[in-house]
Amino acid sequence: GFFALIPKIISSPLFKTLLSAVGSALSSSGGQE
């Protein structure tokens, strides 16, 4: 099912790029508070 796809999604380069982008956005918005 869907959960079998999760490791593939997590290991994909696109996911890592998205995750780092979200992480930097969160840290920058959190740092402004």
Swiss-Prot record:
Which InterPro entries would you find in this protein's record?
A: Pardaxin (IPR009990)
Q: Which residues form the signal peptide?
A: none
* Alphabetical UniProt keywords: Ion transport, Membrane, Secreted, Target cell membrane, Target membrane, Toxin, Transmembrane, Transport
State its location(s).
Answer: Secreted; Target cell membrane
Q: Which GO terms describe its biological process?
A: monoatomic ion transport
Q: What is known of its domains?
A: Consists of a C-terminal hydrophilic region and a predominantly hydrophobic remainder.
Q: What is this protein called?
A: Pardaxin P-4
Gene source species = Pardachirus marmoratus (Finless sole)
